[in-house]
Amino acid sequence: MKLGLMFVNSGPFSNPTLLAHLATTAERCGIESLWTVEHVVIPENYQSPYPYSSSGKIPGGEDVSIPDPLLPLTFIAALTKKVKLATGVLILPQRHPLYVAKEMATLDALSNGRAILGIGSGWLKEEFDSLGLDFHTRGARTDESIKAMRALWSEGASSFHGKHFNFGPVKCYPKPVQKGGVPIHVGGHSTAAAKRAGRYGDGFFPALGEIPKLKELFGVMKAEAEKAGRNPASIELSTMGRPRVDDLKALQDIGVSRVVIAPPAFDVEGLTRGLEKLQNEVIAKI
C-alpha cells in the first residue's frame, strides 16, 4: 500500500517555503506521491454543487488560493529525488491536449520519470462558462484528449483526427521518460468515470466512497476494461481515505494500492510532527 498527500498546491501551500518543507519532509518520511488540485477560476456565487462536501461548496470558500497544478510539481521535482508528482485532478477538457501532452512530458523529463497525470472531466459549469467552453461536451473532449496525448507521446510524428481536436502529422518533444507515456489516472466517482478508466486509464481514482461503493465502481471499471479487450488488473486503483492501518488494509483487500490523504498540518512544525508520526505509526505497518 502506498500513501500520498493531496492538496499540496492549495491554501497555505502556495507559500514556497512551506511547500518546500512539505515536499522534502514527505519524501524523507516515506510518502509515495504528492497530488495537486485545479481550478483556474472560481466564479462568484456559483450554483454547481461541489461533489466532495455536504455543503456543496469548495472548502476554503471562493477566495481559497489554488495555484496552477503543474508549476508547483516542477518546483517539487527540483527539491526531491523519488516522490511521484501527480495531479489530482487536472480538469482535462478545459485544456488543449497538445499543451497538456507537452507540459506532462516536460515534467516527466525534468523529474526523471516521476509524473502521474490524474484527470477529471469537471463539475463546475460556471468555470467552463468563464472559459467559453461547452460544459455538456466535456466527457467527449476528455476521451479525445486522452487518445490525442497518447498519440503525441508515441515515437516520431503523430496525428489525431476527432470531432473536437484535429492535428497532424506533428512532432512533439521531449517524449516522456516513462515507457508508454505518462500514466493517466481517471478521477471521479461516477459510472461514466469508472467506464472511462476501464477503456483508457492506467489508473482509476474515485476520491469518494465507502467500500461497498468502491467495489461497485471497480466492478464497472473492470467490466468496461474487459469489454475493451484490456486486462483490468493492469489498472491501478487509488482512493482517498484515513491514515489508519485497519482502514488501509481493508482498502488493500479490495484491490486499492494507493490511498491519498490530506496533509497532517499546515505549518512547518506541525508538518514535521505529523509526517514523522505517519511514518512510524502507519507507513511502517502497511
Roles of regions detected by a PLM:
Residues 1-286:
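Active-site-adjacent structural elements that line small-molecule/cofactor binding pockets in enzymes
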